[in-house]
């Protein structure tokens, strides 16, 4: 390689875009990852297809995998300017399917969490390559966005991890703030979940 070729190599790498893997990928096959600069730990998001609609907003479950455990969510879309939220549920692969972990009016669990601080931490954003934010959650068969953000979920995992899982041993689960980047596209989607 010549010196000029070595100089141009980083520019060519930037021109390819920030997403690793195929240029196109269906939402249910996408894998998203985020790392922290001071650790080798990886936080992952997968979008798992539901046998039926996971919620009125999407036919996908969101699975957040931290170095400590898995958390499962369904999507909710508010009218107006409120945007997209994720609501915690139990593992949809478990016998009997998922159960809401939130109380009324956001979930059907009579003993579920109703703390507004937790609810405010459950925002969900998808961003395209130009960093435009989508107004609807991902759906099966649609193009997977290159980026996902859960901007305040780290706060909920730190202070209220037990509210986001049915794991009774759940305690503080540290997670950095950042953006999940699409890093792979599975050959086949996750098996369908839910009842």
Q: Model regions: which residues?
A:
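N-terminal secretory signal peptides
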Residues: 16-109
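N-terminal signal peptide c-region/cleavage motif recognized by signal peptidases
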Residues: 10-12
């Amino acid at each position: 390689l010549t010196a000029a070729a070595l100089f141009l190599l980083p520019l060519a790498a930037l021109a390819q875009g920030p997403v690793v893997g195929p240029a196109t990928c269906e939402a249910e096959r996408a894998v998203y990852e985020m790392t922290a600069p001071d650790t080798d730990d990886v936080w992952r998001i997968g979008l798992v297809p539901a046998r039926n609609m996971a919620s009125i907003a999407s036919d996908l479950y969101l699975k957040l995998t931290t170095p400590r455990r898995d958390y499962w969510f369904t999507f909710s879309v508010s009218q107006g300017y409120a945007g997209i939220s994720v609501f915690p549920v139990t593992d949809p692969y478990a016998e009997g399917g998922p159960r809401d972990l939130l109380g009324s009016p956001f979930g059907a669990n009579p003993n579920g969490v109703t703390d507004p601080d937790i609810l405010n931490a459950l925002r969900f954003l998808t961003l395209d390559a130009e960093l435009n934010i989508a107004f609807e959650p991902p759906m099966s068969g649609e193009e997977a966005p290159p980026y996902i953000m859960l901007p305040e979920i780290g706060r909920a995992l730190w202070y209220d991890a037990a509210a986001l899982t049915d794991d009774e041993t759940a305690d503080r689960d540290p997670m950095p703030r950042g953006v999940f980047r699409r890093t792979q596209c599975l050959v086949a989607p996750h098996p369908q979940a839910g009842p």
